Amino acid sequence: MEEFGLVFAGGGAKGSYEIGVWKALMELKIPIIAVAGTSVGALNGAMVVQGDFEAAKSIWTDISVQDVMDVQKDILDKESSASSFMDRINMIKETIIGGGLDVTPLSNLLHSVIDEEKIRKSPIDLGLVTFSLTDFKPVRLFKDDIPEGQLIDYLMASACFPAFKPKEI
């Protein structure tokens, strides 16, 4: 039987779709030997490699903005005093100028669900793409290229959106 590689894209909203694709591939018994992704695609790829479909499905069923980033309540609260669109834009702008959105909640979520040892022992390879701000170019890595104990750091770096606080490795 043929073996296949799976590539997941970045873009937060695509994440739940990608889990649906994974489910369909499992139901069709299509053998996956490698998964590559960037941003949310790298995060989902890690879940595929460790084989935890139910955990991934649960995350995507229950996830909220607060599970990903620490956002001022006024930005999300439709009833807040910052009711105008421009007030909200200005709050976001100030946050970005102040160093970016804090994604500690996402890091905490990954630490609770990602099992680096399981991923490293899996016969399925994991590839991810992140970006070097020093060299100003993409960095492509497979799990064997990532120093032990730093997989979550690299996943966070891959998921780093320009409005987020940068993840330095």
Where are these regions (language model features)?
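Patatin-like phospholipase
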Residues: M1-T38, A46-I169
